[in-house]
Amino acid sequence: MQENIEQLIQNAIPDATVIINMNDGVHLDAIVISPAFEGVTLVKQHRMVMTPLKSAFGSEALHALALKTYTPEKWKNR
Amino acid sequence: MSVQERIQKLVDDNKVMVFMKGTPAQPMCGFSSRVVEVLKRLAVEFGSANVLDDAADPELRDGIKGFSDWPTIPQLYVDGEFVGGCDIVIELYQSGELEKMIVGENAE
């Protein structure tokens, strides 16, 4: 599932850097960095990542996914 | 009134409105609890609706997901706009943006 998620995000946002950590086998941390997030509200950034995942897995399966999105600049300055 | 109209009214009537599992005094989920904690720290007034309270509104839990096209609860609304769920609320709180959205640009 971890590779699938990575691939789906990559397909949706081709220039994204995707970092996924599964800490305990249940909870997933995903960090997505992309210039496509420039000037986009956080909620829209999350939608850009979550919408393709939602259609693949359904909403319930993704309850345990903690998502962080960054523009390259925000990532550098975090 | 349909559930979508009931949600719209709650969002219109409350400048800050949170749809959550449980109540602010007794949250039933860690994510809902964290959003309430943030609002308490900002010391702002907010309205809340418990999506698990079927006696109050059995359609709310699914209705709110359709309203925002967002799959999870809690959900925070400010000035009628959907802000986000737990992760986004915490991030906006930490960057100071949430306070600006609620209190205005003059907030210090």
Region locations from a protein language model:
Chain B
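Thiol/disulfide oxidoreductase modules built on the thioredoxin-like
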Residues: I64-T72
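Local sequence-structure signature of Cys/Sec-based thiol-disulfide redox active-site neighborhoods
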Residues: Q8-F46
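Thiol-based oxidoreductase modules, predominantly thioredoxin-like and allied folds used
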Residues: A43-L60
